[in-house]
Amino acid sequence: MMSLLTPAVLLTQRLHTLTLSVSTPLGLVMTTFESSTLKDARLKLVSQKEVSGRLRLTLGAGRLLYLIQIFLATGTVQFQTMVLPSTDSVDSLPGTYLRKF
């Protein structure tokens, strides 16, 4: 579990599920992402940026990047998965690993 700064974000990873809780002007937004690619993944927070009312989180594991975009005004969440080229790995990028529970 990892807590991030402004706006308040909480990420929790269990098995193949990632739960995201974000405090927005509309209140608390909670959403769950399930993917078989998350099952044995050791997720790393690669970046967190707030741009034009959107919070962008980039998480990674191995050759996969998980791009999460939260629209703070509406609480809408977008989740995308991207595969890195075979020569790249998230392990070589700076960031903080999430702990599994």
Swiss-Prot record:
It comes from the Viruses. InterPro entries: Bunya_NSs. It comes from Maguari virus. Coiled coil: none annotated. Belongs to the orthobunyavirus NS-S protein family. One of its GO terms (biological process) is viral process. The gene is N. This is Non-structural protein NS-S.
